[in-house]
Amino acid sequence: MKSATLLALSFLLIALYFLICEAEHSRYEEHEILEENMGDVVNLEQRSCAKPGEMCMRIKCCDGQCGCNRGTGRCFCK
C-alpha cells in the first residue's frame, strides 16, 4: 500500500512539474520566436556573425550579447 501511494505521488509530482514547465516555456512560443527572428531581414547580417558560444534562441549574435524580453518572449541581439 505504501509503495502504491509513493508511486502515485511521484507520478503526480512529475506531471505537475511538466505542466508548470510547459506553461512557462511552451514549444509553440519558442518556434514562433525562432521563425520571427529568422525572418527578420533587417538584423540578418548582425545575427550571422557570432562570437563562439553566444546565442539568442539558437540564433547567433555578432557582439555575443542577447536580450530576451520576458513580457513578450521576443529575443533580440544587442
From Swiss-Prot:
The stretch of residues making up the signal peptide is 1-23
Q: Which GO terms describe its molecular function?
A: ion channel regulator activity; toxin activity
Localized where? Secreted
Tell me which tissues or organs this protein is expressed in: Expressed by the venom gland.
Which keywords accompany this UniProt record?
A: Disulfide bond, Ion channel impairing toxin, Knottin, Secreted, Signal, Toxin
Chief localisation class:
secreted
Q: Which residues form the propeptide?
A: 24-47
What does UniProt give as GO cellular component? Answer: extracellular region
SS bonds (residue pairs): C49-C62, C56-C66, C61-C77
Similarity section: Belongs to the hainantoxin family. 20 subfamily.
Q: Give the domain note.
A: The presence of a 'disulfide through disulfide knot' structurally defines this protein as a knottin.
Protein's job: Putative ion channel inhibitor.
Can you say what this protein is called?
A: Hainantoxin-XX
